[in-house]
């Protein structure tokens, strides 16, 4: 595994985690809003 591929994989992982975080936060907000 080269350094370039490691950097590329790291970038994809960061993007994936960011999207998951945004989606998870959106779901939590929707659930909290529906409870009230």
Curated annotation (Swiss-Prot):
Q: Where does this polypeptide localize?
A: Cellular thylakoid membrane
Can you list the GO cellular component terms from the UniProt entry?
cytochrome b6f complex; plasma membrane-derived thylakoid membrane
The record ties this protein, via InterPro entries, to:
PetM_cyt_b6/f_cplx_su7
A GO BP entry is: photosynthesis
- Locate the transmembrane regions by residue number: 9-29
Q: Do the record's keywords include Transmembrane?
A: yes
Q: Which UniProt keywords apply?
A: Electron transport, Membrane, Photosynthesis, Thylakoid, Transmembrane, Transmembrane helix, Transport
According to the record's subunit comment, the protein's assembly and interactions are: The 4 large subunits of the cytochrome b6-f complex are cytochrome b6, subunit IV (17 kDa polypeptide, PetD), cytochrome f and the Rieske protein, while the 4 small subunits are PetG, PetL, PetM and PetN. The complex functions as a dimer.
Name of the featured protein: Cytochrome b6-f complex subunit 7
Q: What species is this protein from?
A: Synechocystis sp. (strain ATCC 27184 / PCC 6803 / Kazusa)
What gene is behind this protein?
petM
